[in-house]
């Protein structure tokens, strides 16, 4: 891989290689008192986040450090960005200072692609950690890793993605990747939260959740992104929860093997009931744990591309 910007252009062989590497890394580190591999020693990884993040930012930082890379965090508010410096100039500065890889989260859709274009001649590689409402490829990869652990191969599996599709970069990335890996995807949301052009995503679209439950292998719940909304997309949080929330009654209607995912942060009591979030059938903590190993695998494929040094 030259960069990781989206899952839309990720072929099955590359995606599977990353997932397999993540599994190998997880097993390699299992039970170790010191979780450290020398694979990326001497490499410099910079995280550049223009939006708030807990899981993704910490996960990338841990991933880089566990691979022995030097990890530098650039905060938009505490850097020259706060003085008005452009994304392009900031990126070129970081590359000139020796960054081998820049991990970027930005509120503008397409920001990671533009960054990769500006840095193409420098050799610095780019990972998209979420760009606006466009994509979040490493989230989709860690979701796929979690599903593979719970369900085995994903070909032929049926996965529902439920909630705020309109504002969700997670939904877009997951649809592309799950379909590439052979899964069937059904999108479930109120009509007001379905984006234009969704018919080109290659997934089924439904507006009612309950009829879908008995035939699902997995349900991925999305947070309602109120911070991106300017208007009434549904009558109330209570009515949304009644129609689309994963409660104990709905959990009981899923097949026994079915797994519940959530990319976080969760709104307990809205899209997911606390009892469901804490149920053994939910793999939410596993997603976070797998996120570290998947991001280690992404950095490995971008920066090393050799046998994993144990």
Curated annotation (Swiss-Prot):
GO terms for biological process: 'de novo' pyrimidine nucleobase biosynthetic process; 'de novo' UMP biosynthetic process; amino acid metabolic process. SUPFAM superfamilies: Aspartate/ornithine carbamoyltransferase. Its EC number is 2.1.3.2. Carbamoyl phosphate binds at residues 55-56, 105, 136, 139, 264-265. Pathway: Pyrimidine metabolism; UMP biosynthesis via de novo pathway; (S)-dihydroorotate from bicarbonate: step 2/3. The keyword Cell inner membrane does not apply. Keywords: Pyrimidine biosynthesis, Transferase. Disulfide bonds: none annotated. InterPro entries: Asp/Orn_carbamoyltranf_P-bd, Asp/Orn_carbamoylTrfase, Asp/Orn_carbamoylTrfase_sf, Asp_carbamoyltransf, Asp_carbamoyltransf_Asp/Orn-bd. One of its GO terms (molecular function) is aspartate carbamoyltransferase activity. L-aspartate binds at residues 83, 169, 223. GO terms for cellular component: cytosol. It is an enzyme of class 2 (transferase). It catalyses: carbamoyl phosphate + L-aspartate = N-carbamoyl-L-aspartate + phosphate + H(+). Pfam families: OTCace (PF00185), OTCace_N (PF02729). Heterododecamer (2C3:3R2) of six catalytic PyrB chains organized as two trimers (C3), and six regulatory PyrI chains organized as three dimers (R2). Catalyzes the condensation of carbamoyl phosphate and aspartate to form carbamoyl aspartate and inorganic phosphate, the committed step in the de novo pyrimidine nucleotide biosynthesis pathway. Belongs to the aspartate/ornithine carbamoyltransferase superfamily. ATCase family. This is Aspartate carbamoyltransferase catalytic subunit. It comes from Saccharopolyspora erythraea (strain ATCC 11635 / DSM 40517 / JCM 4748 / NBRC 13426 / NCIMB 8594 / NRRL 2338).
